[in-house]
Amino acid sequence: TGLHKHAWPETFKFEEIRLKRYRMGRGNFLDHVDVGSYDSAMRFLVLFVYLNDVEEGGETEFPELDLTVTPKCGTMLLFPSTWTYLHRGNTPISNDKYILGSYLHYV
């Protein structure tokens, strides 16, 4: 049982935790991946914690996966930072969206 020895790095750490605000009617983040530098590709997981509910808009959308995550207070979203997880932050319509975000990366 457990993860294969090559499935999880022996040494890793979180980057600083960022508080992000997406403003109602104008805050968004266009399609991107979160590997950081393509030369080093140190990041391997993305971590978001939604700090409030957004009734309309504000979703985190993965267009290539046909997946949309609606912001709900206290929900955590964890996904790989690589090119296969292209995503975007849609503009919140009903109210501002607040998230905590960080990345796990290799040391």
What is the meaning of each model-derived region?
Residues T1-M76, T84-V107:
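Fe(II)/2-oxoglutarate oxygenase catalytic core
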